[in-house]
Amino acid sequence: MASSEVFTSEEAAQRAIKTYYESQESRMGYELVFGGTQHFGYYTPGTWSPFPIDKSLRRMEEKLMGWLALPAGSRILEAGCGVGHVALYLAKHGMRVTGVDIIDHHVEQARRSAQKANLPKDQIVIEKMDFERLEAIPSASHDGAFTMQSLGHAFSAEKALAGFFRVLKPGGRFALVEVERRPNAEADKKNPRLTEQLSMINVGTGMPTNERSHDGFYKGLLEEAGFVDIESRDISDNILPVVRMFYVVLLVPYLFVRLLGIEKHFVSMLAGTAGYVGYDRWRFMVVTGRKP
């Protein structure tokens, strides 16, 4: 399904994104479960318990540094930086980070956190900016760039990738850590309601790119943008403990919300349950590449 079939315009997509991240359900959920961080944690396959969650989050950020494979002092762009937790982790480990986001309270909180960290002035810079419109960032100005569960919000992922490619220096590294859909016509026939729920999640969270993704989608984006040395990793098993936890915790309240017919107004709750039930309908991918 193309982005235009989910959202009538880029403006509509951005309204959905802002509505989601400004909702109390979203803000309280991220704060209570992840301490404000907006990405999954990384676990050893076979792990059952998701606790302690904060250690798994930092482990994912450590893994990201490995996937970027850049030396200390590198200038890195984070597209969709949220409240700045990933940017801060990288900055505290010697990277110089430019974080961009379109949500006002994200930008404000990220800037406050950066100030409290007492890092050198240019170690971390947070800007309010749409990562599909990076014209204010000079070409060939960054050694690396990445998205951490944010590229799914793009109205045009192709436009976003072209921008990332432009701002990277020759030899610059790019990494994305994203949910990739796995369309299955047979599964859709067996459980059409689940298919509808998964699309409802993408609409409610403002994720047109996630809705149109499919097996190999992100790898294809990097190839089309001009990246080389592309590698793909499926790390779905590494996030399973927290996906399972969401299902266990949210199932009963979700059933109540569903009974009332108001599930579209509780999209985070829907994502926490349908995401686990439909675990075979998506995978969690890391795709990396280099600008030649």
Curated annotation (Swiss-Prot):
Superkingdom classification of source: Eukaryota
Cofactor(s) this protein requires: S-adenosyl-L-methionine
Chief place of localization: membrane
EC number(s) per entry: 2.1.-.-
Coiled coil: none
GO cellular component: endoplasmic reticulum; membrane
The protein's annotated pathway: Mycotoxin biosynthesis
InterPro entries per UniProt: Erg6_SMT_methyltransf (IPR050447), Methyltransf_11 (IPR013216), SAM-dependent_MTases_sf (IPR029063)
Catalytic activity, as annotated: 3-[(2E,4E,8S,10E,12Z)-4,8-dimethyltetradeca-2,4,10,12-tetraenoyl]-4-hydroxy-5-(4-hydroxyphenyl)-1,2-dihydropyridin-2-one = 8-epi-ilicicolin H
Subcellular location: Membrane
ATP-binding as UniProt keyword: no
Keyword annotations from UniProtKB, A to Z: Membrane, Transferase, Transmembrane, Transmembrane helix
Transmembrane segments: 240-262
Membrane topology: Single-pass membrane protein
A Pfam family the protein falls into: Methyltransf_11
Keyword Chaperone attributed: no
Any one GO molecular function term: polyketide synthase activity
GO biological process: ergosterol biosynthetic process; ilicicolin H biosynthetic process
Function summary: S-adenosyl-l-methionine-dependent Diels-Alderase; part of the gene cluster that mediates the biosynthesis of ilicicolin H, a 4-hydroxy-2-pyridonealkaloid that has potent and broad antifungal activities by inhibiting the mitochondrial respiration chain. IccD catalyzes the Diels-Alder reaction that converts the acyclic 2-pyridone intermediate to 8-epi-ilicicolin H. The biosynthesis of ilicicolin H starts with formation of the tetramic acid by the hybrid PKS-NRPS synthetase iccA with the partnering trans-enoyl reductase iccB since iccA lacks a designated enoylreductase (ER) domain.
Family under the similarity heading: Belongs to the class I-like SAM-binding methyltransferase superfamily. Erg6/SMT family.
Name this polypeptide is given: S-adenosyl-L-methionine-dependent Diels-Alderase iccD
Originating organism: Talaromyces variabilis (Penicillium variabile)
Classification of source organism: Eukaryota, Fungi, Dikarya, Ascomycota, Pezizomycotina
Gene that produces this protein: iccD
